[in-house]
């Protein structure tokens, strides 16, 4: 149970930071921290979505930072992601994307992230993906 609580805290904190960045900067006009490039962040986020769509959760997990890998297993990724793909059907396209960045003052790290909306045969899935300075994934949220 403690591991699940830790995962929830990490995901909630990351989501709150990304949402605050979007709200405070006018929907994605946030300047990325030094060392990040919009094109690289967008490309990495799209790569993670491609792996999600292919149900290649091991490769998706491998994109993660050590902290992310310690907080979730490949099997947990599958359990969380499969229902979305089962419900929404075949992937069509990314219809919206916003790239932003900020600093996690608690962890003392700069991060960059993307919020992307994927259109699927039977619905939409919103992805929030964030990366640290090494471009390792520190967050992968779907809703």
Language-model segments: what does each one mean?
Residues 58-109:
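Short solvent-exposed beta->alpha transition segments
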Residues 98-143:
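Exposed beta-sheet edge and beta->alpha loop/turn motif
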Residues 37-53, 63:
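Short, aromatic-enriched amphipathic alpha-helices that serve as compact interaction elements
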Residues 23-26:
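C-terminal motif of bacterial Sec signal peptides marking the signal peptidase cleavage site
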Residues 28-30:
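Bacterial signal peptide processing site
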